[in-house]
Amino acid sequence: MTTQPRIKTTVVGSYPFPDWLGALPSEQAVIDATRVVIHTQEQAGIDLVCDGEFSRFDVNHPETNGMIEYFVRPMAGMRTAITFDELVAYRAQRGMGFRTRPPAVVEGAVGAGTLDLPHACARSRRLTTRPFKFTLTGPHMLAKSVIDKHYRSVPDLAMAIGDALADQVRHLDADVVQVDEANLPGSPDEWQWAAAAINRVLDDPGGYGDRGRVIM
């Protein structure tokens, strides 16, 4: 009788972006790179595989590999054209040293817009028969990265982004959903509203069921 390990192995999520994919990006190239990453994990005996996050990379946004842009720019309520005055104000903010440009400006109520995480998830899910983990950037990080001219409150914006992400999560074909919050360790005093926004994503009763949840 084969028993499953109580503690399963996995990887953080993102993989180094291969040069050849950046030189010749296409839907098929993303699939090929993802297949290599997943197969490497399977060969190593990883229990819970993930896709390397290649579909989110953007060579035009090297500071964070286009990760933030991937999530916020398709959302409703976001403006992507940034004025010079907005750039100057953004660069003067504390905690934004890792970026020189905002990914977007919030000008209206945030919604899912054209964001389609289920498509990216399904594309990777088809490449493995192992348990699959899908990762996404969390509402705390996303809310703090944009310029907010609508909510005028980062916690309120984070809640709205959390709701938009929850709409996506309920449709994901993944065994585990991982929320990445890289900015939160540097802002521990924001934990209460950050936790509330993250819970908006992961505690959605609309279909999440018994799937695993991870916060990084």
PLM regions: where:
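Domain-level signal for soluble alpha/beta catalytic cores
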Residues: 1-216
